[in-house]
Amino acid sequence: GFITIDRTEALTAIDVNTGKYTGNNNLEQTVFKVNKEATTEIAKQLRLRDIGGIIIIDYIDMHEEENKKEIIELLAQSLKKDRTKSQILGFTKLNLLEMTRKNMCNNDDY
C-alpha cells in the first residue's frame, strides 16, 4: 500500500491506498494489514515533515470495530516516540480518523 499526504492551510489530509497489494482472500484482514502498515508510516511522516494542526486520515474502510480500535491504539503507540503533543479524536461517521498535532514551527510550504 501507499499513503498520499495533502497539506492545505486548513488541515492535512492523509489518504491510505492498497496499491497493487492484494494479500490473502480475506478482504477485511488485507485492509487491516495495509492500514496497520500505513499507521506506522504516517506517525513517522508526521515527525519527519513536522506536520501539525488538524490531521484527517482516510484509511481504507474497515467494517470491524475491533480493527478500528487497534488502529487507534497503534497510532497512539507510534506517536509516543514523538516529542510533539498529539491528540487522537477517533473515527468519524465517514470513517475518517481525526487527530491534532501541535504546530512547533511556522511551516508554510504546503
Regions found by a protein language model. Give the residues of each.
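Conserved glycine-centered short motifs in functionally critical loops
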Residues: G1-Y110
